[in-house]
A protein has these predicted regions:
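Flexible, acidic/Gly-rich N-terminal and inter-domain linker regions that tether
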Residues: 1-68, 349, 355, 359
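Conserved, mostly hydrophobic/aromatic
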Residues: 43, 78, 82, 103, ...
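N-terminal pre-triad scaffold of radical SAM enzymes
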Residues: 57-86, 104, 119
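Structured C-terminal cap/extension of enzyme domains
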Residues: 97-98, 344-355
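Radical SAM enzyme [4Fe-4S]-AdoMet core and its adjacent flexible, acidic
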Residues: 43, 134-163, 229-230, 234-236, ...
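Catalytic cores of alpha/beta
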Residues: 269-286
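Iron-sulfur (Fe-S) cluster-binding segments and ferredoxin-like electron-carrier domains
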Residues: 85-102
Length: 360
């Protein structure tokens, strides 16, 4: 049933879904078609306040607004299709990019805003480096039913070319009043490594000009069975990307400041055992030479394959049973494997209620 729902969220091929409920039918209409580039440009050309609603100002400063006040959305949609992420359902698997002229117009407008000090905090989207990279076949016929764009590796029909984003960032940086343009959105390192023509040039440009000390990437895990359950690529791409990143950071010229990789990790995802977290810690120590700090305990989000696996204990694509850690203390313990013993916590009455242990 879930696969029927998920496949039916492609706007180009979707039809109405009907489910009988008592004497009536529940009807889910197909999603709207993706916005055209012209429509997306028109939406972003509107004069937004770039501030919190006046109602919330009475409660004092809102710190979160400062991270996005001077940022630019370059595109929407994501074809990464990580099993734990609902963006593919919310925004669609078709990436729609704004025109260069629209983005440059917004960047120029930002320079005129009160409080702007020359720094554009982010130019990106759900995945920063999907800008202007989309499959022409998918635009016409919709997403493939039994094939993903990036998993287990990039599809040959995906025209990987980071050139347009390189040019865009350079042009924004050249606008009078702009001191620095940052890319703070996450980057798919597998796309960088699969772009044989401009991938390394893109990485060099980002490291040299567009990150403020840390580049965010999301390997999420390292063991094959957990990565498979997540719909994430293997560690080969990660190791190659890290090596290229390190080469740039070992450059002794003044062009490069010392930069670091920030790794996002998920603990207690369906299929992940305590031993898997120990293996991940060892991988991070030996291969990444770091202890990741951005670790979160898996949260099952609606409309995702990972939530389906969490609640059913069944691997979504094979129908086989899969281990799911539901004990709240043990879930936190998986996170603590990476972060250290200070992050272990004692159980509270809210964890178990009247039960001694939650049942799987």
């Amino acid at each position: 049933m879930f696969k029927t729902f998920y496949d039916n969220n492609d706007a180009i091929t979707a039809t109405g879904l009907c489910q009988i409920q008592d004497t009536r039918y529940l009807v889910q209409n197909p999603p709207n078609l993706p916005l055209s580039q012209k429509e997306l440009d028109e939406i972003h050309d509107l004069t937004y306040e770039r501030d919190v609603h006046p109602y919330y100002r009475t409660g004092g400063p809102t710190k979160a607004i400062e991270t996005i006040r001077f940022s630019i959305a370059s595109h929407r949609g994501c074809y990464g299709e990580c099993n734990f992420c609902s963006i593919a359902v919310h925004q669609g698997r078709n990436v729609v990019s704004r025109s260069e002229s629209s983005i440059l117009k917004e960047a120029l407008a930002i320079t005129k805003l009160v409080g702007f000090r020359g720094y554009i905090s982010d130019v990106g989207g759900p995945t920063a480096n999907m800008y202007m990279i989309e499959c022409e076949q998918k635009k016409e016929k919709g997403s493939c039913k039994n094939k993903r764009c990036l998993y287990p590796k990039a599809c040959e029909n995906l025209p990987l070319n980071h050139g347009p984003q390189i040019e865009l960032l350079n042009k924004i940086a050249g606008i009078e009043g702009v001191k620095k343009v940052f890319v703070a959105s996450g980057i798919r390192y597998d796309m960088v490594m699969e772009d044989k023509k401009r991938g390394l040039k893109y990485l060099e440009n980002i490291v040299k000009n567009h990150i403020s000390g840390q580049m965010k990437i999301a390997p999420e895990h390292a063991t094959p069975q957990v990565l498979k359950a997540m719909g994430k690529p293997g560690t080969e791409y990660l190791k190659k990307f890290k090596n290229e990143f390190n080469k740039l950071n070992n450059n002794e010229t003044d062009e490069y400041s010392r930069q670091y990789l920030t790794y996002y990790i998920i603990a207690a995802h369906p299929g992940c055992t305590f031993k898997d977290m120990l293996d991940l810690k060892e991988f991070a120590r030996k291969e990444l030479k770091i202890t990741p700090e951005q670790v979160q305990v898996f949260t099952p989000l609606p409309s995702t394959y990972s939530a389906l696996m969490y609640h059913t204990g069944i691997e979504s694509f094979t129908g086989k049973e899969i281990f799911v850690e539901k004990d709240p203390i043990k879930r936190d313990s998986q996170k603590a494997v990476i972060l250290g013993r200070d992050h272990y916590r004692r159980p509270t009455k809210h964890d178990y209620g009247d039960k001694k242990r939650l049942r799987r």
